[in-house]
């Protein structure tokens, strides 16, 4: 006689594919049919989703020589975009994704090079890692590139990269490519070199709460601000820390200055300042998160993994995972850029914050 616990356990043991007769399985396969119950627990597991994203770390000092070597081996004409992809082994390196919805790549542009104009369906941002003299022209607006700047190249907008300086420039590409590719909606269109228009969004939208209104007209641009200078973001973090010293988490979000919405509609982007010696435990949330060290040194504890982040290092954490960040300096702040899947999760109604 089975007791209650054994009956409950057995009731949750679903039938296996190999339990079915081979001729029945063959007939299903011939008709493009699949029985659900052998795979039901894999696609609908209890309490926490099945995650292929693994805690993963990329050292910039390790990958930089390989990126520069790519510059020697492959001219820009043969690469179009010279990138080393930061691939999460949990998804398989051939998938070229950091998480379910995030693609990361370190891109190199050498002096005098020009990456031709194109547009594509995935959204992208560029977090500038090092170097001066390069620029991205987006929808006719020329955006200079300096370390820590965030530059948007949203879906459907023409963009190209040029370099008038004398040293290599490197930036971190962050795209929602895995999601758009999975939806079978990913493609690009080549274009002609853009004509640069006068004016820049990062000059017109410079103060919170104040927006341009020529003859009482608000901007109708979907993305009025394309470049978020690091100097402004850093100053905002320092000001916030000084104004609210009791606040544990000093963090800002990159937003559309006209609407207050996230800067792009699939991925969210943030800048975080850790005070000297500070340890910060982040809430356990549903979206995966990427961390990129802009300034300083930090330690990231992601589940059972611990990574020491130096400037330009990057790591990622799967969703539903405990993350603790620590500033390894006792006298200097640490600045971290973050990207996550929050906007997507909120739009789909699956966002969770478990505290």
Swiss-Prot record:
Cupin type-2 domain ranges (all copies): 106-174
Q: What is its EC number?
A: 1.13.11.4
GO biological process assignments: naphthalene catabolic process
Classify the source by domain of life. Answer: Bacteria
Return the protein name: Gentisate 1,2-dioxygenase
Function statement: Catalyzes the oxygen-dependent ring fission of gentisate between the carboxyl and proximal hydroxyl groups at positions 1 and 2 of the aromatic ring to form maleylpyruvate. Can also catalyze oxidation of alkyl- and halogenated gentisates. Exhibits higher affinity for 3-substituted gentisates than for gentisate but has higher activity with gentisate.
Give the SUPFAM superfamilies listed for this entry: RmlC-like cupins (SSF51182)
The UniProt keyword set, sorted, is: Aromatic hydrocarbons catabolism, Dioxygenase, Oxidoreductase, Plasmid
- Reactions catalysed: 2,5-dihydroxybenzoate + O2 = 3-maleylpyruvate + H(+)
Please list the GO terms describing molecular function: gentisate 1,2-dioxygenase activity
Provide the taxonomic classification. Bacteria, Pseudomonadati, Pseudomonadota, Betaproteobacteria, Burkholderiales
Q: Which family does it belong to?
A: Belongs to the gentisate 1,2-dioxygenase family.
Q: CDD domains from the xrefs?
A: cupin_GDO-like_N
User: Which EC class is the enzyme in?
Assistant: oxidoreductase
In the UniProt record, the gene name given for this protein reads nagI
Q: Which pathway does the database say it acts in?
A: Aromatic compound metabolism; naphthalene degradation
Q: Which InterPro entries match?
A: Cupin_2 (IPR013096), GDO-like (IPR047183), RmlC-like_jellyroll (IPR014710), RmlC_Cupin_sf (IPR011051)
